[in-house]
From Swiss-Prot:
Pfam annotation, one family: Anticodon_2
Domain of life: Bacteria
Motif 'HIGH' region, chain ranges: 7-17
Organism lineage: Bacteria, Pseudomonadati, Pseudomonadota, Betaproteobacteria, Burkholderiales
UniProt protein name: Glutamate--tRNA ligase
Primary gene name: gltX
NCBIfam families assigned: gltX_bact (TIGR00464)
Length: 460
């Protein structure tokens, strides 16, 4: 088995493309096959090196390294020219000298008759047919001589049997007047040369498939199997777009989503394994079967993605999680190396949905101390609270500094002063962290360290 992913580098890798790549990658891995990456960069005006790199970075982040490639179409122009010449010689392609305006007029005339708009075959050679004079000042396009009779059918791996009447398929342009080949032609030659056996792609390509099948047949090539995956919709049921939030895969990296979570969530958009919502990359490969790909569109759900990401954060080893969060802390001006970041992760991760949230919360321990705003201090640092804090500080100097001992000390101060937990817990937080809300106060004090805690209490 040989599958492929063939993006156009005219922008970032979007979520729909990433999911298609994931399905093709998992399909190949499941069958111990080969996953090929091909960059379809023939749109010279819109293709950029930055977009190519963004695609490669996204696939690397998701862990979908190709077995072969990336191959670039712009480096295969000689091969396309060779195949075009062979098709012209074999009569499966021909030169067409119609201007774009003439073709538009043909289509309008067909519409006026209630027919499907199409090229009328003016330059298509037929036995006994006299072709028009060749214009002296016009370069021709090359058209594929599509079969007129019968139908082109295939058993789609996702949608089931699909058939197109050949009479409704006009003769496709496969090379422009400047000689550059078109998308549908390059795809066919690439799939043929690269021995692609299975093509999984978005269902916006369904109408291209009969044309590509007919070109492959004209070349005498073995046909791959095709599967067309429905699109991803936004939460409102409309086609997923920028107005629904981020659609660039790498934006999710920047926002603090784990690649493990992204792979898990993307796979569940249009594929299922029973009722399993959470699974590893290895389980995806083991379980992947095109029979379990959905025929209907999937809906993007940011809340579900957050839930999946939180699951992976919670289950990750504290030291590994610290390694992923540390650069995000540093970007905020924090000093992760000055704190016990793995222990901090252990304290914070159960509440976090993203690495960015973790990094922000970790600044409590790794960032510069910001005293409480005056209004917050006035609300919580009352005379009663300050007396209790002074008592706590005095006793703390001789207390072993671990969570259990700190908890016991807090309880002792509460008992001796007849206070309830919020009457000391909140003032402690405000005085030591500048915030009224933090994780468990005894754990926070332990991680900040005795010296830091006493210094901040002394400064009141």
């Amino acid at each position: 088995m040989r599958t492929r992913f063939a993006p156009s580098p005219t922008g970032f890798l979007h979520l729909g493309g990433a999911r298609t790549a994931l399905f093709s990658w998992a399909f190949a891995r499941h069958h111990q096959g080969v996953f090929v990456l091909r960059i379809e960069d023939t749109d010279v005006e819109r293709s950029t090196p930055e977009a190519v790199q963004a695609i490669l970075d996204s696939m690397d982040w998701l862990g979908m390294q190709p077995d072969e490639g990336p191959f670039y179409q712009m480096k295969r122009m000689d091969r396309y020219a060779e195949v075009l010449a062979g098709m012209l010689e074999a009569g499966t392609a021909y030169h067409c000298y119609c201007s774009p305006e003439e073709v538009d007029a043909m289509r309008e005339a067909a519409r006026a008759k209630g027919l499907k708009p199409r090229y009328d075959g003016t330059w298509r050679p037929e036995p006994g047919k006299t072709l028009p004079p060749v214009p002296a000042d016009r370069k021709p396009v090359i058209r594929f001589r599509n079969p007129i009779d019968g139908a082109t059918s295939w058993n789609d791996m996702v949608k089931g049997p699909i058939s197109f009447d050949n009479g409704e398929l006009d003769d496709l342009i496969i090379a422009r007047p400047d000689g550059t080949p078109t998308y549908n032609f390059c795809v066919v030659v690439d799939d043929w040369d690269m021995g692609i056996t299975h093509v999984l792609r978005g269902d916006d390509h369904v109408n291209n498939t009969p044309r590509q099948i007919n070109i492959l047949r004209a070349l005498g090539a073995t046909l791959p199997e095709y599967g067309h995956v429905p699109m991803i919709l936004g939460p409102d049921g409309e086609k997923l777009s920028k107005r629904h939030g981020a659609v660039n895969v790498m934006e999710y990296d920047a926002q603090g989503y784990l690649p493990e979570a992204m792979v898990n969530y993307l796979a569940r958009l249009g594929w299922s394994h029973g009722d399993d919502e959470l699974f590893t990359r290895e389980q995806l490969v083991e379980w992947f079967d095109t029979r379990h790909l959905s025929k209907s569109a999937s809906q993007w759900d940011p809340k579900k993605l957050n839930w999946v990401n939180a699951h992976y954060i919670k289950g990750m080893d504290d030291a590994e999680l610290a390694g992923r969060v540390a650069p995000r802390v540093e970007r905020r001006g924090g000093k992760p190396q000055a704190a016990d970041l793995p222990a901090i992760m252990g304290l914070l991760k159960d509440r976090a949905e993203t690495l960015e949230q973790l990094a922000e919360d970790a600044m409590l321990f790794c960032g510069e101390y910001q005293p409480a705003p005056a209004e917050l201090a006035a609300q919580h640092l009352t005379e009663t609270a300050r007396a209790a804090l002074a008592d706590f500080a005095a006793r703390a100097r001789d207390t072993e500094w671990n969570r259990a001992a700190i908890s016991a000390l807090i309880k002792a101060v509460l008992a001796d002063r007849g206070l309830k937990m919020p009457q000391l817990g909140i003032p402690l937080r405000v005085a030591v962290t500048g915030r009224a809300q933090t994780p468990a106060v005894d754990a926070v004090l332990e991680l900040l360290g005795k010296e830091t805690v006493l210094a901040r209490l002394q400064a009141l």
